[in-house]
């Protein structure tokens, strides 16, 4: 059964526009504002059709769901993940509870990364700038068992010293120190079955703003 949904899909523009995370999407979709909160590591502040989801307390459910490779990220924290291998992003505006369950009053943002290709190859990107800006991104694809098991290894590290001088503490800030790395396995023993497994970790030691509990 066909279900009418207001959807914006971004594909070819991802690499051309250097889109690395969902916060870079605001210029590519109508009625969408996406930013990063200052009180949660990689926390998102998303507005779709006037409905805002920027809860800083992890005990509060977001009103807009973010999916990464089909897996829901249950809180706003960690939703602004830096990715080097984005393949497609879909923005579904309006309530999506029938198809996606809870936390979808405002809509759903689906982020899909590239799958292992089964062929050997890769890409590397480096950026160096002012204020100690250092960015390194890498991705490698390789077959393990030809036409059956493929592997993709990826990693990102971003560091900078910040661009604001704190006259009280006598230091620059806010500093950024972010690392994300992992591996994805694609198992296709035949034409009727496939299994995709991703193992990854990300660490964010970046400076964040002051925080107070909204329930106090």
Task: Annotate each PLM feature.
Residues 215-216:
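Surface-exposed loop/turn segments flanking beta-strands in extracellular/periplasmic regions
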Residues 121-123, 128-160, 164, 168-209:
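Transmembrane beta-barrel wall of Gram-negative outer-membrane proteins
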């Amino acid at each position: 059964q066909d279900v009418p949904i207001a959807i914006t899909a971004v594909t070819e523009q991802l690499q051309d526009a250097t889109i690395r995370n969902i916060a870079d999407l605001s210029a590519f979709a109508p009625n969408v504002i996406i930013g990063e909160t200052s009180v949660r590591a990689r926390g998102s502040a998303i507005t779709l059709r006037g409905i805002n989801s920027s809860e800083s307390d992890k005990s509060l459910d977001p009103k807009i769901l973010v999916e990464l490779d089909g897996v829901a990220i249950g809180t706003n924290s960690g939703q602004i993940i830096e990715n080097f291998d984005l393949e497609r992003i879909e923005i579904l505006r309006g309530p999506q509870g029938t198809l996606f369950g809870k936390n979808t009053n405002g809509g759903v943002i689906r982020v899909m990364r590239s799958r292992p290709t089964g062929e050997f190859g890769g890409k590397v990107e480096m950026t160096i700038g002012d204020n100690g800006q250092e960015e390194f991104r890498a991705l490698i694809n390789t077959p393990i068992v030809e036409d059956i098991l493929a592997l993709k290894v990826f990693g990102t590290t971003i560091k900078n010293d910040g661009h604001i001088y704190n006259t009280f503490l006598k230091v620059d800030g806010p500093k950024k120190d972010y690392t994300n790395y992992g591996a994805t396995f694609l198992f296709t023993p035949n034409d009727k079955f496939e299994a995709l497994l991703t193992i990854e970790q990300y660490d964010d030691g970046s400076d964040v703003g002051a925080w107070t509990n909204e329930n106090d």
